[in-house]
């Protein structure tokens, strides 16, 4: 429960309104090819109605992962079962799902509830059933129970989703994560708003409102701080804000451009873009001491730094070849090498958490789309077909990318799986949305 408790501490500090999605999630492609899974409503073992439907959270998470497709509850062969002991393997032979999630919820003191869930391997259960009677332990992939409060139902639903996803894919789930983004609503006197929400757009909280532009939010590796660019003082400045204490620290306010902050893997420094010495160049600034080190030195524009996971190199966008392309600089030697060659432009790059791929914006035939390049084979795959894509940010498990795009003339957020198969759009209820950033694991 340590992970859930840490996440809840942040959620309580940030959330001042009931759980509600500020960003809708409209899935546009990829569900039909997903892996079928059964998620049954958790059986309520108390008086009246259950506080919340945990199974609904789990089903929504699994759909949004792009990997799984929960089956319609009405077509499931058993109803109102909450434990593996009630599961009848022979009844599920024609369902076609690979796993079943089921559970129970019951009161456990004042504002406390005991939540239990089981994850059943349906394929293994059916194969074993053909050989004769089997015990539940032979096909049980996971079984847990936890005491939570009513306020923790949604978060624990995300935790169950994380467990199920990892058990079935071998990849850590990223459902207990958050996103930051900028909302622009010109009907308000201070139209620029820096927001934080759960990964699915629920529990949105405003961190800052300004009459001047806000841009480029990025998370610290521990998920405790955000760095961003603000023009609130009529010039570009970089701030770091603690999400727990709300304390803001001005990190960079040099003449000219102060932009594109990116936390180092140890969280102690920021890679930033400064133009204080002429052309925009890449620098590293120590957050505590404000000491800076210049990394690039070229007459062309260098911007949009991003760290390799090992902290030994940066990638950045540069026009030193005539058009925007992505380059790598080794911090120990200063050696610079060009990384991208396909298409007209390539910019806004970031390395996936496993260090194997790069996600970036590719322009080909005048169209801006999100692309992925395998760093070992150099094979590039265009992932999206939306318009004017920008600002890609990778989920901490490397399976999904959130990015800004244009839909029906408005700036919105969208998501695409890193294999390009699953796609979704995240329109806001009010205003336009841009500059998304996905948190680390929390």
Curated annotation (Swiss-Prot):
Location of the protein in the cell: Periplasm
InterPro entries attached to this UniProt entry: 6-blade_b-propeller_TolB-like (IPR011042), PD40 (IPR011659), Tol-Pal_TolB (IPR014167), TolB_N (IPR007195)
Primary location: periplasm
Superkingdom, taxonomy of origin: Bacteria
Gene Ontology CC annotations of this record: periplasmic space
GO biological process, any: cell division
Subunit structure: The Tol-Pal system is composed of five core proteins: the inner membrane proteins TolA, TolQ and TolR, the periplasmic protein TolB and the outer membrane protein Pal. They form a network linking the inner and outer membranes and the peptidoglycan layer.
PANTHER family in UniProt: PROTEIN TOLB (PTHR36842:SF1), PROTEIN TOLB HOMOLOG (PTHR36842)
Family to which the UniProt record says this protein belongs: Belongs to the TolB family.
The name this protein goes by in its record: Tol-Pal system protein TolB
Organism: Shewanella baltica (strain OS223)
């Amino acid at each position: 429960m340590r992970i859930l408790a840490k996440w809840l501490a942040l959620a309580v500090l940030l959330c001042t309104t009931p759980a509600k999605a500020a960003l809708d999630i409209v899935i546009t492609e990829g569900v039909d090819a997903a892996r079928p899974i059964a998620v049954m409503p958790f059986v309520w073992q108390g008086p009246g109605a259950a506080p919340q439907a945990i199974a609904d959270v789990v089903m929504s998470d699994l759909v949004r992962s792009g990997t799984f497709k929960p089956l319609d509850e009405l077509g499931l062969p058993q109803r109102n079962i909450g434990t593996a002991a009630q599961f009848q393997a022979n009844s599920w032979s024609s369902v076609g799902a690979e796993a079943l999630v089921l559970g129970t919820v019951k009161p456990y003191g004042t504002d406390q509830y005991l939540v239990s869930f089981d994850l059943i391997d349906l394929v293994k259960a059916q194969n074993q059933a053909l050989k004769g009677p089997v015990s539940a332990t032979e096909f049980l992939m996971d079984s847990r129970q936890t005491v939570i409060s009513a306020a923790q139902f949604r978060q624990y639903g995300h935790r169950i989703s994380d467990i199920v996803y990892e058990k079935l894919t071998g990849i850590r789930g990223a459902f207990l994560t958050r996103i930051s983004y900028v909302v622009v609503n010109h009907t308000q006197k201070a139209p620029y708003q820096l927001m934080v929400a759960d990964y699915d757009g629920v529990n949105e909280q405003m961190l800052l409102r300004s009459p001047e532009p806000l841009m480029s939010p990025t998370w610290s590796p521990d998920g405790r701080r955000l760095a961003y660019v603000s023009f609130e003082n009529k010039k570009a400045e970089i701030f770091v804000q603690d999400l727990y204490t709300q304390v803001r620290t001005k990190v960079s306010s040099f003449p000219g451009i102060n932009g594109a902050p990116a936390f180092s893997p140890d969280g102690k420094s920021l890679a930033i873009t400064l133009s204080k010495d002429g052309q925009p160049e890449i620098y590293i600034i120590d957050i505590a001491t404000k000491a800076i080190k210049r990394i690039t030195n070229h007459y062309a524009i260098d911007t949009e730094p991003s760290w390799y996971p090992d902290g030994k190199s940066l990638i950045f966008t540069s026009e030193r070849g005539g058009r925007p392309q992505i380059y790598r600089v080794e911090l120990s030697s200063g050696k610079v090498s060009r990384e991208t060659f396909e298409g007209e432009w390539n910019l806004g790059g970031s390395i996936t958490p496993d260090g194997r791929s790069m996600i970036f914006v590719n322009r080909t035939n005048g169209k801006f789309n999100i692309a992925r390049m395998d760093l070992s084979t150099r094979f590039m795959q265009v992932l999206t077909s939306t318009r004017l894509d920008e600002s890609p940010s990778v989920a901490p498990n490397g399976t999904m990318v959130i990015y800004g795009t244009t839909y029906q003339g408005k700036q919105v957020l969208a998501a695409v799986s890193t294999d390009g198969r699953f796609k979704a759009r995240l329109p806001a209820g009010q205003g336009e949305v841009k500059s998304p950033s996905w948190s680390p694991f929390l």
